């Protein structure tokens, strides 16, 4: 039988590569597309060239972490982070000075590309090393001495006021009766306190005793003591305040500067207890003494600070001071616990654990650690403690865990569609909140169950999030979306028809929502850039899904890049060093002085 000649027209070649059999693939798909650009306006053409910007350095490292700082339209920088090294360049390729007073040991890594995550907020770029375990400072706050306050609250005629220390009566005073008007001075609270103080000074040694009006402060200089009072007035005449009291109303009108007492509240639980301290003018909420209330800043995320002179400073966030052009500045500092104790204001859950991701959401800095999401206090990116334990405050820090029937270690967080999408190895969750993000309004719900490649951070582009998946020695990309009609969340495999196309593991996902383009950097073919072009109509129907690749010189290693203002900036390692280049994504733009593009 002779072969039949079949003739048919192909309307376009816009849907890129497919590895399906010819009988199955779409007419506008091909088996190979290299250095071609599938554009829904101009059709299939040649990809734009890269433009050389600068040779950054002579380094030949192949796994640098690349981060682009897009501060504003006038200031953008490329950050290269390596083992105990951080370098910064502007987008013209000029090297910026990076002062490193401390903290470079935090950047110890054998695989910077996977171990480091960065996020930029204004002049601060936070760098987290995912291999570091967060620790406390190891320094306990100074413990208060054993102390007490005796408060003469009421004076009555012919009443005995007595103080007992360690089981022995050490001070006693009986007021006069009311038979004579001159006896009225006997019952003033100041007089009673004076008489009791005189007895205390006479009968006690090794104590510090201070009277202030009707208040008597007693401190044992070494060791502890017990104390009791009696007044013949049912406990309403002479009040003892030592260690703890049942109610804030039980406190005297004044105290001794630095004196701390615990308000125990409901005796059935410790969760409503709190501590107050006399600060010299008022009783203010404070923290229990003798606790480790601070982080070891050498284990916390570090800072790359853009300084006033346009250069940079890499350091711990420990509040150190520095000078630029004669002006003094102070580095930010991670706040310490200032209220409560380990029960009412517990350590954030990232303590003794590793931080897997760092992000910014609704004016809060956020960490992912184990199964928990931890947010800073709103607007206070260095505060991860409650500011009061007496009530729930909307802008306080938030620390909550995902709920699932299997272990779900959270790896990445991506803001999306007014929500925060959380990725674990096998599941996806959404963090939802009402108009105000607070511990009272926030919730986490599981949405989809897809395995991810946890070596590459997902990226949000337009109405979708793209995340990597592993197929053995190849990789793929899923497209997470919300169905506009049903609001059901799902993740479509964009590489289902080319399962053996992206070689190796994904090193990076970057893209431009204005140009409907996703770029994938892969470990198995580091001289190529995998390109996904997509287009959706007004009803969210996909009119284009096109995978292809841009090939570079075989010896080139594409480290990573990012998109800024319709340009893809790429850091490329070559045999003699590291280069910065850019690729124009505006397909319909012509070259200056010409009426047509030069390819």
Label each region the model flagged.
Residues 83-87, 131-133, 215, 364, ...:
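Loop/turn residues immediately N-terminal
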Residues 77-79, 126, 364-367, 419-421, ...:
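Conserved beta-propeller blade signature
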Residues 2-74, 475-599:
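Beta-sheet repeat architectures centered on beta-propellers
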Residues 56-74, 111-121, 347-361, 402-417, ...:
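Structural signature of eukaryotic scaffold interfaces centered on beta-propeller domains
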Residues 113-134, 420-423, 430:
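Elongated alpha-helical scaffolds
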Residues 106, 115-117, 124, 130, ...:
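Long, charge-dense tracts
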């Amino acid at each position: 039988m002779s072969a039949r000649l079949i003739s048919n027209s192909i309307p376009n070649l816009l849907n890129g590569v497919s590895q399906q059999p010819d009988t199955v693939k779409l007419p506008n798909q091909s088996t190979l597309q290299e250095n071609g650009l599938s554009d829904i306006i101009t059709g299939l053409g040649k990809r734009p060239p890269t433009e050389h910007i600068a040779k950054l350095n002579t380094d030949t490292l192949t796994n640098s972490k690349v981060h682009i700082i897009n501060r504003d339209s006038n200031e953008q920088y490329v950050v290269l982070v390596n083992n105990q090294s951080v370098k910064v360049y502007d987008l013209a390729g000029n090297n910026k000075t990076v002062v490193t007073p401390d903290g470079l040991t935090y950047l110890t890594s054998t695989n910077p590309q996977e171990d480091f995550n960065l996020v930029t907020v204004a002049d601060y770029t936070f760098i987290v090393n995912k291999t570091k375990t967060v620790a406390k400072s190891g320094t306990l706050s100074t413990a208060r001495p054993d102390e007490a306050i005796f408060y003469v609250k009421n004076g009555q005629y012919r009443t005995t006021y007595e103080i007992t220390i360690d089981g022995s009566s050490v001070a006693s005073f009986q007021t006069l009766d009311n038979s004579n008007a001159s006896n009225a001075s006997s019952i003033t609270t100041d007089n009673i306190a004076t008489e009791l103080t005189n007895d205390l000074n006479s009968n006690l040694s090794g104590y510090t005793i201070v009277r202030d009006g009707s208040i008597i402060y007693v401190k044992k200089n070494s060791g502890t003591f017990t104390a009791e009072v009696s007044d013949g007035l049912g406990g309403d005449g002479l009040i003892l305040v030592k260690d703890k009291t049942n109610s804030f109303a039980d406190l005297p009108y004044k105290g001794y500067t630095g004196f701390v007492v615990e308000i125990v509240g409901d005796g059935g639980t410790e969760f409503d207890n709190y501590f107050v301290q006399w600060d010299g003018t008022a009783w203010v909420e404070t923290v229990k003494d003798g606790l480790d209330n601070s982080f070891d800043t050498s284990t916390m995320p570090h800072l790359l600070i853009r300084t006033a002179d346009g250069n940079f400073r890499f350091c711990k966030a420990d509040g150190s001071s520095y000078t630029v052009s004669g002006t003094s500045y102070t580095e930010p500092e991670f706040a310490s616990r200032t209220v409560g104790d380990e029960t009412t204001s517990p350590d954030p859950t990232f303590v003794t654990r590793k931080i897997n991701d760092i992000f910014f959401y609704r004016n809060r800095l956020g960490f992912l650690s184990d199964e928990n999401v931890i947010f800073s206090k709103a607007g206070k990116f260095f505060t991860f403690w409650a500011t009061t334990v007496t009530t729930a405050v909307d802008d306080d820090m938030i620390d909550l865990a995902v709920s699932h029937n299997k272990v779900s270690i959270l790896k990445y967080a991506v803001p999306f569609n007014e929500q925060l999408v959380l990725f674990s190895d096998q599941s996806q969750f959404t963090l939802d909140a009402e108009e105000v993000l607070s511990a009272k309004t926030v919730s986490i719900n599981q949405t989809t169950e897809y395995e991810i490649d946890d070596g590459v951070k997902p990226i949000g582009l337009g109405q979708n999030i793209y995340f990597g998946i592993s197929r053995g020695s190849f990789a793929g990309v899923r497209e997470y979306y919300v169905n506009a009609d049903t609001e059901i969340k799902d993740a479509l495999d964009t590489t289902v028809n080319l399962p053996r196309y992206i070689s190796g593991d994904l090193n990076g996902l970057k893209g431009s929502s204005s140009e409907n383009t996703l770029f994938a950097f892969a470990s198995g073919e580091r001289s190529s850039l995998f390109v996904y072009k997509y287009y959706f109509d007004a009803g969210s129907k996909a009119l284009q899904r096109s995978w292809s690749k841009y090939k570079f010189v075989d010896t080139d290693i594409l480290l990573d890049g990012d998109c800024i203002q319709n340009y893809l900036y790429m850091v490329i390692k070559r045999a003699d060093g590291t280069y910065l280049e850019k690729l124009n994504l505006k397909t319909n733009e012509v070259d200056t002085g010409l009426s047509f593009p030069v390819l």
